Swiss-Prot record:
The keyword Hydrolase applies. CDD domains: LamB_YcsF_like. SUPFAM superfamilies: Glycoside hydrolase/deacetylase. Keywords: ATP-binding, Hydrolase, Nucleotide-binding. GO terms for biological process: carbohydrate metabolic process. It is an enzyme of class 3 (hydrolase). GO terms for molecular function: 5-oxoprolinase (ATP-hydrolyzing) activity; ATP binding. Disulfide bonds: none annotated. It comes from the Archaea. This is 5-oxoprolinase subunit A. The gene is pxpA.
Amino acid sequence: MKVDLNSDLGESFGRYKLGLDDEVMKYITSANVACGWHAGDPLVMRKTVRLAKKNNVQVGAHPGYPDLMGFGRRYMKLTPEEARNYILYQIGALYAFVKAEGLELQHVKPHGALYNAMVKEEDLARAVIEGILDFDKRLIVVTLAGSRVVEIAREMGARVAQEGFADRAYNPDGTLVPRSRPGAVIEDKEEIAERVISMVKDGGIRAINGEWIELEVDTICVHGDNPKAVEITAYIRRRLEEEGVKVLPMGDFIK
């Protein structure tokens, strides 16, 4: 049994520091690095890639809407052409630093509102995946487990990693409960670890209303932008390994 642990990193910008990247990087296997549009800048991007290299963590691009003020969490209506080229542009920007450090790019995980919009809008999902495949057909597309995006990406010939969220509540339809709703974000490390183990070993999780939903997950997102992030991430990894789960980069087992 195998699973990848990923985290959204490199989200500082200029003098503004966000996240505990140096510490979280010790416990994950894949890093989603912001590409400068919702967060990150050239200095932060290179620093984050170097940090991943130091910790033997695989690097992926984390492109989002062009929305620094809103941190990429506000919806924007894009044409398919805009979406395809926005993604290609951001992957290319990060890849410059990846190549400079002698690494390979493993995956692409869209950020925030873009990630969520792809689940609802098939045309947007196709355009984003086209942008990813334009760059490199070997890149893994990371998307919400059980969503229509998984089917679309596979139909288009992409490698896909289905993602579960360690600290987020789920709706009965398998989508994430909006952050604005009570109970959307889970903070207790024991509960978080049990939910992760349930997803990985039992193939599902309890929705916010108590319903059982089936989820096939390849990678678990752990957040690195809250005070307990390091403790929770380390605990999740330890618990998984105690359960006999191998924690590996997604590129090692996604076909």
